[in-house]
């Protein structure tokens, strides 16, 4: 037994009951009774009519037991160590004064620059020693004659 739902009121319609309304666009509406059909055809809003299921749902009617509010899970902040740094180190860095942190940063930058300069200097020396004897006259490229085609005449293609 297939039980339908009323398109207006939302109540169950048992087989053999209630009118069916088919619109020109092919949409079919089933109603519980003539009262629902006439209300639908006069374009009444079922949410504003007291006896419909939609109204009762909207205004929270007929809920026998008070449903306790769902507890939402809140994100809790939790501090933990990051790979390569323990929690104590992180907290110590955070509690440092900005001047100290700035001085440390500048010192680290200076050390990195010096290391880079030293590396470049050694690289320069090694490249000069290997490049010096292998100095030969560069070959000149011979220009190839370009093939000149006749101008294109005619339509688009």
UniProtKB/Swiss-Prot annotation:
Quaternary state and interactors: Component of the large ribosomal subunit.
Name of this chain's protein: Large ribosomal subunit protein eL24
Keywords, in A-Z order: Cytoplasm, Ribonucleoprotein, Ribosomal protein
Residue spans of biased composition, Low complexity class: 131-145
One term of GO molecular function: mRNA binding
Protein's organism: Ictalurus punctatus (Channel catfish)
Annotated Gene Ontology cellular component terms: cytosolic large ribosomal subunit
GO BP annotations listed: cytoplasmic translation
Highest taxon above the source species: Eukaryota
Basic and acidic residues composition-biased segments: 96-117
Region (Disordered): 96-157
Compartments reported by the entry: Cytoplasm
Gene3D superfamilies on file: 6.10.250.1270, Ribosomal protein L24e
Listed SUPFAM superfamilies: Glucocorticoid receptor-like (DNA-binding domain)
Described purpose of this protein according to its UniProt entry: Component of the large ribosomal subunit. The ribosome is a large ribonucleoprotein complex responsible for the synthesis of proteins in the cell.
